Amino acid sequence: MYEVKLDAFNGPLDLLLHLIQKFEIDIYDIPMQALTEQYMQYVHAMKQLEINIASEYLVLASELLMIKSKMLLPQSTSDMDVDDDPREDLVGRLIEYQNYKEYTAILNDMKEERDFYFTKRPTDLSHLETDESWDPNHTIDLTELIVAYQRVKNRVELNTPKSVEIRKETFTIQQATEQVTSRLKDKDHFNFFSLFTFSEPIEQVVTHFLAILEMSKAGIINIEQQRNFEDINIIRGVNYHFG
């Protein structure tokens, strides 16, 4: 009998990742029967306790059962020559979600480290003026976004007095999200670096990055860069809406 633990999870992929880590499962070679049983026991437990189950949990349950069924089907000789693993799409989504969690944890650590320090000094931003021509078909990955964050962080820290501690004013991810959404209200894209004055508190810079990660993950925005190390553009995603 498997143990069912009713923890709070951020969606069905979070639950699956928890089960994979708990039972030390190889994410690239998932035993679908065991994992599906664990997942279904969790869903059944929620039903028995009359917990409201989000539809996305039930959708993934159906997907797991379908993958499990495909894995149990006998393969013909011709099928053996085809590299078509029914788990491939699920594994890709789990790895992408795991990467988001790791990057979010890194940025949260950076935010906590510098929560109480900031400087406010005028900065010449004329060198950040960019050509408005850009290729909307070129996307960037999280690694390039982290590099961009480090560039902003380094510029802020150059003018940060290390020995001065002040009482911070909390700047939330919700506020940062609203700022980005508002910027896209009348224009379908804007330059990423224009979000920063390089004189704001470092915690505000980190909060903006966390908000951008979450908005990108949710499809509210897309993050585009024409070539490596050039300026980054934030554009409206398929799930963008204002108000």
Swiss-Prot record:
Q: Please provide one cellular component term from the Gene Ontology annotations of this protein.
A: cytoplasm
> What is one Gene Ontology biological process annotated in the Swiss-Prot or TrEMBL record?
cell division
Q: Where is this chain primarily localised?
A: cytoplasm
This protein's UniProt keywords = Cell cycle, Cell division, Chromosome partition, Cytoplasm
Q: Where in the cell is it found?
A: Cytoplasm
Q: Which Gene3D superfamilies match?
A: 6.10.250.2410, Structural maintenance of chromosome 1. Chain E
* Primary role: Participates in chromosomal partition during cell division. May act via the formation of a condensin-like complex containing Smc and ScpB that pull DNA away from mid-cell into both cell halves.
Q: Which PANTHER family match?
A: SEGREGATION AND CONDENSATION PROTEIN A
Relate the assembly described in the record. Component of a cohesin-like complex composed of ScpA, ScpB and the Smc homodimer, in which ScpA and ScpB bind to the head domain of Smc. The presence of the three proteins is required for the association of the complex with DNA.
Q: Which family does it belong to?
A: Belongs to the ScpA family.
This protein's name: Segregation and condensation protein A
Species: Staphylococcus aureus (strain NCTC 8325 / PS 47)
Gene name of the encoded protein: scpA
